[in-house]
């Protein structure tokens, strides 16, 4: 007779969870930030709001975003005028779009990740799907399983309505799944489409306007597993530890509410200030066990909520400008894609490191940190270890 302890030991992996492949996807429709204010005020029939348009232009100029991708085209918006109003009942139209498009965009990214991984998709044991764009039953996890033709016995986890910190959450969850189930291969997908949040401008709700200037669509997928098969699977980053916390005195700092008018966002407090004031505590808790206290000795992947957050974090921690290069690059090329952002940044970092001939996937460094920030105010902190290139 075997003991429970023996069974338990046999069920667990030996090494740490590792990212084995990354894939990303965006809708085809690309919008230049410099042209967006004119387009946005025209399509929402708001051109008479000249002062507000000037304010929006300034927001777009300061956003550090060059371009974004959006499922919503001019044609779609003309067919759905309620999406262009500030507060018109429009949830049905929004939902009809996202319940189809979110899994579809997720499939695009997942297909790329599976191809890079190079293993048969029948070896995928778990699916973790995350989106803040719409809800449905069965969920986007089920739709993705069907679209990809995964085994019906694949173990699924669906995360809805988490917001911008959730790129860290999916890594934390996938780490536990991979390390506690020997041989597990977890397909992680974050897919975000702004069709739930797009709306016309309003003079009194400027935080909504901030969202219109920042948010973009995108999907990212990872394959995560422990104990990579030598010569077959190629690890890119190891997941060493993961933590989540709610920042003190931050109630209502970022809120999202799903209502008849779609998903509305409210930024009620000094979000960049709250994050920069508390970030060192999270770093100390994560890196003290490793004996690391020089934040410039790490490679950095931070959710780019907006340029002000990055500027204040950089200033507070005295980070060298190049530390947030990959983060700023993704913000500039794609905008804020909510949960998918940090996964795009992981992809950008390992790509650039290979291109520049650096010795590791983490800008030549050994240890790194990934931060997710979002509603709560919630912070996810993931400690990463790079892999030699």
From Swiss-Prot:
Q: Which Pfam families match?
A: Chal_sti_synt_C (PF02797), Chal_sti_synt_N (PF00195)
Protein's cellular compartments: Cytoplasm
What does the record give as the reaction this protein catalyses?
Answer: (E)-4-coumaroyl-CoA + 3 malonyl-CoA + 3 H(+) = 2',4,4',6'-tetrahydroxychalcone + 3 CO2 + 4 CoA
Which Gene3D superfamilies does the entry mention? 3.40.47.10
Can you tell me which family this protein belongs to?
Belongs to the thiolase-like superfamily. Chalcone/stilbene synthases family.
List all membrane-crossing ranges. Answer: none
Question: What are the positions of the active site?
Answer: 164
Q: What does this protein do?
A: Involved in the biosynthesis of prenylated phenolics natural products which contribute to the bitter taste of beer and display broad biological activities. Chalcone synthase that can use 4-coumaroyl-CoA to produce 4,2',4',6'-tetrahydroxychalcone (also termed naringenin-chalcone or chalcone) which can, under specific conditions, spontaneously isomerize into naringenin.
The broad enzyme category this protein falls into is transferase
Record protein name field: Chalcone synthase H2
Keywords attached to this entry: Acyltransferase, Cytoplasm, Flavonoid biosynthesis, Transferase
GO cellular component entries: cytoplasm
**InterPro entries, per database record:** Chalcone/stilbene_synt_C (IPR012328), Chalcone/stilbene_synt_N (IPR001099), Chalcone/stilbene_synthase_AS (IPR018088), Polyketide_synthase_type-III (IPR011141), Thiolase-like (IPR016039)
Query: What EC number(s) does this enzyme carry?
Result: 2.3.1.74
Question: What pathway is this protein a component of?
Answer: Secondary metabolite biosynthesis; flavonoid biosynthesis
Coding gene? chs_H1-1539
| GO MF term (any one) | naringenin-chalcone synthase activity
User: GO annotations under biological process?
Assistant: flavonoid biosynthetic process; polyketide biosynthetic process
